[in-house]
A protein has these predicted regions:
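Carbohydrate-binding surfaces of carbohydrate-active enzymes
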Residues: 1-298
Length: 298
């Protein structure tokens, strides 16, 4: 412990004031609403395994593994700062949120939402007129019914190219009202009904995930969405390192952290830049040992 604290002090001394006043820009915002969290946790259904935080974690994990910068944003945030907003399980839609999301998408933003969204208002009263309530026009769909699967049950869903995947937990029975289907259920009594949809709204797009897809299908869908939103990873190379960035008007600083127990090669794109913690130039095939950190100045 003493050695670690000593090392930290040395590193902070090396950094000086170089990173003071830097910002951490992100093109992606994940909407996390505490009222929504509490309302969903205390609802009596439709599935015991539906947890708001689990859904937030699943979406965040996708971006984290791709080294895509993300902000966790409240419902009253400035949505215009982002290219892509993810709002999973937006069960409670407060007054003003619908309008803010519509304005965001109209101007070219991409929105991702899905099952159990647009169910109640801020007083926890159910919206009348069908689901997803106030988000119905924005998503271009009407959800007639929600089928809750038992923990051991699975459904099958087919992409338009014929690729099939399994889904679990909840299955929205979706009617298209302007949106197009990206994938349809291929089993159960609602085979042929849309499971995942895409709707053009103004200059932007809304994606609605009406069921919980298996990991490979979820990654495939999110990859397509990220590409459409023109959101890019901080590094072009695939790496297990955590990479974050902080910027000033003049400089860009990359923070590389190896959270694994294996030695990992630093991506080639950083070769020739300066390691602020050592003052040395980053070499090609440079190794970052387990739990080591590099702060690189571009």
């Amino acid at each position: 412990m003493f050695r670690e604290v000593t090392q930290l002090g040395t590193e902070l001394e090396e950094l000086g004031d170089q990173i003071l006043g830097t910002a951490n820009p992100a093109d992606v915002g994940i909407l996390f609403d505490w009222d929504n969290y509490w309302a969903l946790e205390f609802t009596s259904g439709p599935h015991k395994d539906l947890k708001y935080v689990d859904q937030i974690h699943r979406h965040y994990k996708f971006f984290y593994e791709k080294n895509i910068a993300v902000d966790m944003i409240p419902r009253d945030a400035d949505f215009s700062k982002y290219k892509l907003i993810v709002a999973p399980v937006l069960y409670m839609v407060h007054q003003g949120v619908k309008e803010a999301l519509e304005a965001f998408v109209k101007k070219g933003g991409v929105l991702v939402t899905g099952f159990m969204s647009g169910i109640v208002g801020e007083s926890d009263n159910v919206y009348l007129g069908g689901y997803p309530g106030p988000l119905r026009d924005l998503a271009g769909i009407w959800v007639e019914e929600i089928d809750a699967l038992a923990p051991e049950q699975k459904n099958s869903v087919k992409f338009k190219d014929g690729t099939e995947f399994t889904s679990t937990m909840l299955c929205d029975l979706i009617h298209l009202e302007g949106a197009e289907s990206m994938a349809d259920y291929s089993s159960n009594f609602y085979a042929g009904i849309p499971a995942v949809t895409k709707n053009s709204y103004g200059k932007g797009t809304v994606y609605y995930l009406g069921t919980q897809p298996e990991d490979c299908a979820f990654t495939r869908m999110m990859d397509c969405i990220v590409k459409e939103a023109a959101v890019k990873s901080l590094v072009d190379e695939r790496t297990s390192l955590e990479v974050t960035v902080r910027k000033t008007k003049e400089n860009t600083f990359y923070f590389l952290i190896n959270f694994s127990k294996e030695e990992t090669v630093v991506p080639q794109c950083f070769a020739g830049m300066q390691n602020l913690l050592t003052g040395e130039t980053v070499s090609r095939q440079e190794i970052l040992k387990p739990f080591e950190v590099e702060i690189i100045k571009k």
